[in-house]
Design a protein with these regions (language model features):
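N-terminal accessory/precursor segments of enzymes
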Residues: 7-8, 39
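Residues forming anionic-ligand binding surfaces in small-molecule and nucleic-acid pockets
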Residues: 12-26
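Internal, well-folded beta-alpha domain core
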Residues: 22-173, 178-184
Length: 184
């Protein structure tokens, strides 16, 4: 089915907005090593990928209806396996995934886990809203920031200040870090 000579490292294979802003093609060896040890990519087709895992192009969304065994969809098919593949001894997960993918993990969290969702928003009228394209850009940029700074302590993520975003401590909690984009 797959020829290994046609596989591309996952972190270089995806072309979505988040991956464009992550800009892995200009990473140095140290950033690739950091990502290999810390980043996990949720894939509807492959499950959990490390950045250097080889993939072949595909188009499959997590919400796709499938008939695999007793599973009616990919959420049922993957079940707890995705969670077990991302949790490590630190019990810390920094969630930069979309809601479609993060719910694959959230369902299986335990009280021992520290799960921090990163929220990117901006003021629209009198309330903060998430704008999809800008949030995707910021997710990629944040992965880049984390890798460039070799972040090991989640609190260091609060220093992220790219694309006009800054940390809002007044809106954040231990489980949710909120970053607001200031529109000029």
């Amino acid at each position: 089915l797959f020829r290994s000579n046609r596989l591309t490292p996952a972190v270089l294979a995806y072309e979505g907005i988040a991956f464009q802003y992550m800009a892995p093609s200009v990473f140095e060896i140290q950033q690739f090593e950091y990502l290999q040890n810390h980043l996990r990519i949720l894939s509807a087709f492959y499950g959990i990928l490390k950045p250097m895992d080889g993939v072949t192009p595909y188009r499959l969304e997590m919400q796709a209806k499938v008939g695999i065994g007793d599973a009616k969809n990919l959420y049922e098919y993957w079940g707890e396996l995705l969670y077990r593949s991302v949790i490590d001894d630190s019990r810390i997960i920094i969630n930069l995934a979309s809601k479609e993918y993060s719910k694959c993990i959230e369902k299986y969290l335990t009280p021992q886990d520290r799960y921090i969702t990163i929220v990117f928003c901006e003021l629209s009228g009198d309330k903060l809203v998430t704008k999809g394209t800008y949030a995707k850009m910021a997710r990629g940029e944040m992965v880049r920031f984390i890798a460039e700074n070799n972040i090991e302590n989640p609190a260091e993520i609060q220093k992220f200040d790219r694309l006009g975003y800054s940390f809002r401590s007044d809106l954040s909690s231990d489980s949710e870090y909120v970053f607001e984009r200031k529109i000029k």
